[in-house]
């Protein structure tokens, strides 16, 4: 395998959503391949037809592409090693199964599900690890079943599976790129089913054959596949193939260090997409679930290009990685703070257009959807929002007149002297031809000073009148962005609508 071009793969089953653990596996395979100037491949493992979900394959690939993980070869992109869907490769698996049967490395098994369960329960009662009892192992392979009985069953068309014959008393060993040397005793290995009664291969059989035929050099996958390694290595040995290098990634854990599961929170990438997390933040976050740049590095925000240049399996740990959503949210904030304004503007326009289809704005649509106006909103709000969609939802007062006013703020700030003061100040603003933040601030201070009042007497009521809430960015800059016409209309409307709270 020395000198061979690096080839890695992500091989999901089309059974539904893309798990965040699956995204990490795909990402690490992608980063490793790209770092080594190799190829990253997507193969769909749909041998379990009972669990197959319609369109799951397309959704999986589109989610990966949204994350910036683009395959060099896949069912959608094609390639020289196809088909890339296992259900389209059945004749290949049957041919290799026949070869194993002929070489006495596999055998037919006609045991019924009831017999298998009975045997399993018996072994459990005896305190044994359940394994197939080799009832149908032929006499010429060390078993007790006459060849005539096997032939009779085949001639009758009885349903069967094909099992691998695990050698007795051998040690199966390999060097994991993350965990080091690992050894298995064949006495602990079951005679794995290779071909099911429906004519489809099991994951173990199809995966080994495809990994060899597609010439993958490195198999990077979750540690949950470690128990399957001896079966896979034996199959490589049966066929006389050199196995690829293997790396088994650490488990993903909840904050309480239990295994990450849907019972304790969202585990689908699509869940986080719907909440508004960006692909950059999710990829950055997932990359750090097991990998770190090394001692002395304090960098936590990485672009895809940086991840490719810095990623190595040597820096992937063995211990479980804690999935902390707070860290993901922190990363999202960092990206919003540094993302180019024009990119954010382009991203939030569809969100705003959807809102405009529901609600009518008081200002012209042309103005509030213009790049110039949206850029001002972004610059003013980017320190205050957690997700891009909040530039529209959390900051809706930049686009729509408030329909209500925060009750607690009104009770505290809307005193009896506020309406006449606001009316008087609004008249002054109307005559202001220089409607900038600096000018508005100077005008307000000059207005309240002779009255012996502090600016806060008007600052808070103006914010309530204009935005409907008691919090937000710099008031003066907010007024400048909204513009004189909208500000005056909202102040005067609030004077009419808000009742002075009873003393």
From Swiss-Prot:
Residues the record lists as binding ATP: 262
Localization: Cytoplasm
Motif ('HIGH' region) on chain: 12-22
Record Pfam families: Anticodon_2, tRNA-synt_1c
An example Gene Ontology CC term for this record: cytoplasm
Broad EC category: ligase
Key words, A-Z: Aminoacyl-tRNA synthetase, ATP-binding, Cytoplasm, Ligase, Nucleotide-binding, Protein biosynthesis
GO biological process: glutamyl-tRNA aminoacylation
InterPro entries per record: aa-tRNA-synth_I_cd-bd (IPR045462), aa-tRNA-synth_I_codon-bd_sub2 (IPR020751), aa-tRNA-synth_I_CS (IPR001412), aa_tRNA-synth_I_cd-bd_sf (IPR008925), Glu-tRNA-ligase_bac/mito (IPR004527), Glu/Gln-tRNA-synth (IPR000924), Glu/Gln-tRNA-synth_Ib_cat-dom (IPR020058), GluQ/Sye (IPR049940)
Keyword presence, ATP-binding: yes
Catalytic reactions on record: tRNA(Glu) + L-glutamate + ATP = L-glutamyl-tRNA(Glu) + AMP + diphosphate
Motif ('KMSKS' region): 259-263
Record-annotated disulphide pairs: none
GO MF entries: ATP binding; glutamate-tRNA ligase activity; tRNA binding; zinc ion binding
Enzyme Commission number(s) of this protein: 6.1.1.17
Subunit structure: Monomer.
Family to which the UniProt record says this protein belongs: Belongs to the class-I aminoacyl-tRNA synthetase family. Glutamate--tRNA ligase type 1 subfamily.
HAMAP family: Glu_tRNA_synth_type1
Biological function: Catalyzes the attachment of glutamate to tRNA(Glu) in a two-step reaction: glutamate is first activated by ATP to form Glu-AMP and then transferred to the acceptor end of tRNA(Glu).
The name this protein goes by in its record: Glutamate--tRNA ligase
Classification of source organism: Bacteria, Pseudomonadati, Chlorobiota, Chlorobiia, Chlorobiales
């Amino acid at each position: 395998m020395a000198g061979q071009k690096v080839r890695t793969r992500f091989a999901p089953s089309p059974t539904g959503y893309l798990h965040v653990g699956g995204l990490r596996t795909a990402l690490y395979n992608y980063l490793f391949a790209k770092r080594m100037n190799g190829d990253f491949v997507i193969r769909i493992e749909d041998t379990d037809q009972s669990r197959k979900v319609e369109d799951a394959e397309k959704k999986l690939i589109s989610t990966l592409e949204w994350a910036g993980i683009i395959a060099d070869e896949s069912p959608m992109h094609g390639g020289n090693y196809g088909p890339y869907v296992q259900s389209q490769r059945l004749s290949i698996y049957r041919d290799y199964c026949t070869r194993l049967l002929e070489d006495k490395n596999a055998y037919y098994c006609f045991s019924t599900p009831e017999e298998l369960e009975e045997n399993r329960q018996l072994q459990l009662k005896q305190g044994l690890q359940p394994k197939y009892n080799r009832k149908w192992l032929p006499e010429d392979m060390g078993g007790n079943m006459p060849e005539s009985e096997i032939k009779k069953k085949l001639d009758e068309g009885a349903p069967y599976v094909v099992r691998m014959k695990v050698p007795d008393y051998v040690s199966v060993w390999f060097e994991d790129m993350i965990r080091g040397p690992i050894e298995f005793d064949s006495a602990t290995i079951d005679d794995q089913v290779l071909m099911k009664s429906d004519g489809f291969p099991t994951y173990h059989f199809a995966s080994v054959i495809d990994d060899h035929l597609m010439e993958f050099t490195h198999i990077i996958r979750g540690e949950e596949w470690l128990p399957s390694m001896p079966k896979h290595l034996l199959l490589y040995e049966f066929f006389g193939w050199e196995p690829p290098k293997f790396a088994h990634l650490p488990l993903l854990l909840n904050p309480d260090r239990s295994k990450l599961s849907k019972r304790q929170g969202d585990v689908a990438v699509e869940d986080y997409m719907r909440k508004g997390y960006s692909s950059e933040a999710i990829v950055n976050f997932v990359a750090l679930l097991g990998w770190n740049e090394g001692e002395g590095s304090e960098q936590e925000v990485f672009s895809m290009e940086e991840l490719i240049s810095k990623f190595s399996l040597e820096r992937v740990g063995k211990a479980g990685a804690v999935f902390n959503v707070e860290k993901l949210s922190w990363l999202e904030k960092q990206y919003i703070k540094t993302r180019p304004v024009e990119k954010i503007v382009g991203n939030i326009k569809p969100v705003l257009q959807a809102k405009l289809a529901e609600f009518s704005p008081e200002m012209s649509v042309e103005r509030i959807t213009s790049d110039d106006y949206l850029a001002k909103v972004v610059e003013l709000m980017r320190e205050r929002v957690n997700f891009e969609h909040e530039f529209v939802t959390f900051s809706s007062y930049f686009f729509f007149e408030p329909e209500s006013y925060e009750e607690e703020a009104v009770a505290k700030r809307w005193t009896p002297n506020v309406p006449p003061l606001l009316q008087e100040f609004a008249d002054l603003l109307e005559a202001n031809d220089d409607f900038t933040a600096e000018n508005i601030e100077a005008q307000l201070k000059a207005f309240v000073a002779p009255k012996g009042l502090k600016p806060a007497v008007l600052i808070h009521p103006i914010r309530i009148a204009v935005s409907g809430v008691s919090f937000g960015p710099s008031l003066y800059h907010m007024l400048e962005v909204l513009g004189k016409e909208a500000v005056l209309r909202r102040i005067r409307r609030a004077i009419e609508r808000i009742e002075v709270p009873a003393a």
